[in-house]
Amino acid sequence: MTAPKTDRRILRTRALLRQGLAELMQEKNAGDITVNELVAHANVNRSTFYLHYTDIDQMLASVEAELLERIEASVQAHPIDPHQAQIFPLVGDLFALMAENREICAALLGPHGDMAFLLQIEAILSRYSLQVLADAYPDRRADLDSGYSFCLSGCVGLIKNWLQAEEPAPPEVMAQRTYRLIHNAMRGLCPGVEA
């Protein structure tokens, strides 16, 4: 049985609110944005906002939860096999997801974003990648931790830069670059470990 479809008007309203939130978060922290400010910016009635969300914090939590759910689904769809260098499909999916949600991802990962959101993404990636590698190479844990931290920080910087770019490279190009950087870094930092 398929899930019931959401009314187009609801989807449109949520998209307007989400876009408005992303635009306002380019200027200020979500905690400093009022419902009145958001609905005026998004050109949506205040009462309509309250049909969907209780406040800005709940809206932000809802948007983040949806994105985290999709990130986790992508990671689960492409399990990491430490003996096969097959992370490219996962990296491709993650860049496609971010491209599809560019404005809100740029806001969440930008200077006025939510550090907790980034930490949750890191936890998902760690749970599904670092742990698999650590289980496969228990005697290399220190090397893996260093390599993973290096790659993760580099990827976060690369993603932030890409999301803020005026003329960003296509997601497929970014996925290829990122994969190459991860693969080369892990090979250099952890000889004998495939990433």
Predicted feature locations:
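Residues in the recognition helix of alpha-helical DNA-binding motifs
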Residues: 20, 52, 62
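Helix-turn-helix
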Residues: 24-58
